[in-house]
Amino acid sequence: MTEKIFPVGKLPVELLSRLLAQAPVTDPRVLQGPGVGLDCAVIDAGETLLVLKSDPITFATDEIGWYAVQVNVNDIATAGATPCWFIMTLLLPEGQTTAGLAEGITQQVYQACQEVGISVVGGHSEITFGLDRPILIGTLIGEVRREALVTPRGASPGDRVLLTKGVPIEATAILARQFPGRLEDVLTAAELEEAQGFLYHPGISVLRDARIATHAGQVTAMHDPTEGGLVTALWELAEASGHTFVVDPAAVPIPPLSRRVCAAFELDPLASIASGALLMTVGAEDAARICRALEAEGIPCSEIGVVESGPVAVGRRTASGLELLDRPERDEIARIFEG
């Protein structure tokens, strides 16, 4: 019997769960190992905890070094940790690689790390058979005090669900940078430039968001919505915590420019790669204070739902009960790259 071939994107969650459950974790110092919705590993290093993350850049080719640092920083930030040490693996395409290409990507990584105070401590590079574009994989290690650790498992019934900035910031930037010709009839030249600039403003980093939020009140869980967008991130938090997430899709902030870009490609903005927004659950009594603290620093924050006791689920309330939000099988922009 022929095995099913999976499309571009994350592995099906059932397969991924099965694979991760088989991972050998025998060291008692591993406080958090692999699991669906768990952004980072956590290791007991004595006085502090080490937080580790690995993430590739596969959709974008423009500013790939910048992307690689930011997406790894984001996951370290969602643990409440400080990013410290970066390791890069750079796979370059055969028949296309020049000194300028290798130097350009490497300098992007160095600059992005310097801006956040990260040391680049090692890695690997090669020209790889079969690639048609560069692939960059980053591994980032951070530190956090034991009492300051935030994990995706921390959400509890009654917590409020908050989202910073809006979605999908990253998809907007990628589509505008990779496929500008397909937006020429939809956006003005100034609007196209603005959409391309979403990489930096509002930006795909959530490091400031996480630091401000955790200092302002009780943050019980944080997550960085990447592939599969906000809806996938909500499902991952629900699975990690074991609870039901009830959300109001109409309350999710979508920048007007993002809405127009997604419409031009016929994409669902809630299921498109969304780095730049911080998804978090917070104590009900702290929700307003955390939002005010973020907004005082120029970071919009919206309450989009609540955590309830019940089975793992993500949905919206209707007159007939909880209507589940379908979990995306893959990120929306994968269709564009395939086409």
Over which residues does each language-model region extend?
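Active-site-proximal betaalpha loop/short-helix elements
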Residues: P93-T97, G197-A274
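Beta-strand->loop->alpha-helix junctions that form or flank phosphate-binding loops
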Residues: Q32-G35, P225-T226, T244-P253, A271-I273, ...
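Small-aliphatic-rich amphipathic alpha-helix that forms the alpha element of a beta-alpha
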Residues: T61-I87, G104-E115, R208-I212, T232-E236
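Extreme N-terminal cap/leader segments of soluble proteins
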Residues: M1-A60, A79, M88, Y110-I118, ...
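Acidic, Ser/Thr/Pro-rich beta/coil linker or hinge segments at domain junctions
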Residues: E3-S17, E295-G339
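General beta-strand structural signal in soluble alpha/beta enzymes
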Residues: Q32-G35, D44, V51-K53, S119-G123, ...
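Helix N-cap motif at beta-to-alpha junctions
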Residues: V282-A288
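Glycine-rich anion-binding loops of enzyme active sites
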Residues: D44-I57, T82-R182, V306
